[in-house]
Amino acid sequence: MVDYSTETITLRKTILIDIDGTIFKHNQNLSKMATDKQELIEATVEKFLEWRAKQYYIVITTARVEGLRRVTEKQLTDAGLFYDQMIMGLPNGCRVLINDDKPDGTITA
């Protein structure tokens, strides 16, 4: 049996990041979004490399429809970006993250 009162738990940080307007410059034209090479926002690749070095779990979030998954994956790969998970088809608009407070005071966000 594990004694959890003496066990040290390392919490891996999770990054949730939107695509359009955050990774790539915003493109309102859906047909261009699906076919054109997207323009990266400055310093995006460097930030992703920093997150990888820190072993963060990266979740891409987007309102892009599921039908654009393959082209979106290719755009991200062609830009030299990597991620652990991608959530597509979210509603347009603000996204709010609500995270818990750990009883021992561990900072989680």
Regions found by a protein language model. Give the residues of each.
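HAD-like aspartate-dependent phosphatase fold
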Residues: M1-A109
